[in-house]
Amino acid sequence: MASIVSVGFDQLEEELLTMADSSGRIAKAALYDGADFMADKLRAATENLQVEDRRRKRSKNVLDYEKEALLNGLTIEKFRDDRARDCVQTSITFHGYSDHETEDYPGGVPAIILARAIIAGTVFRVKNRFFPNAFNRNKKEAEMIMVKKAESEMQKILK
């Protein structure tokens, strides 16, 4: 009768169990590096917005207080464990308010609304997709950074 001899399965099982126990930490470390890289690229795209001193009809540029509010409000959200999808998530978004008070926003215009108005355009603003364009341009590189970080974390665990 034929027989099969397997060598090394106990070690493989032990390594897989170790990796499963550390998977959350590995994912968070990789996501942290990817989010940090993407936040730097999105900040650079925000810094590259052209500024004008006063509002012109149908301009693509932003006012100085708008750009300042966007730069001050760009943040990486707290990491969240999504148990339903079995993953770790974060987002890069705008928080805070501008110093410019309006009738609708006496405490200042929210930075997220400014960003949305710049990206989508309004009756007095030509749309400028600075944020989605920067994200799409750098998405693959951020994914590669996360893969490399995950691989290096796995190598540390297996040593």
Over which residues does each language-model region extend?
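N-terminal, Lys/Arg- and Ser/Thr-rich interaction peptides
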Residues: 1-25
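Prokaryotic Sec-type signal peptides and long signal-anchor helices
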Residues: 13, 41, 83, 134-135, ...
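Short, low-complexity, charged/polar segments at coil/turn and helix-coil boundaries
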Residues: 17, 21-122, 152, 158-159
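Short helix/strand-capping connector loops at secondary-structure junctions
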Residues: 119-136
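C-terminal or internal capping secondary-structure element at the end of a domain, subdomain, or sheet
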Residues: 134-159
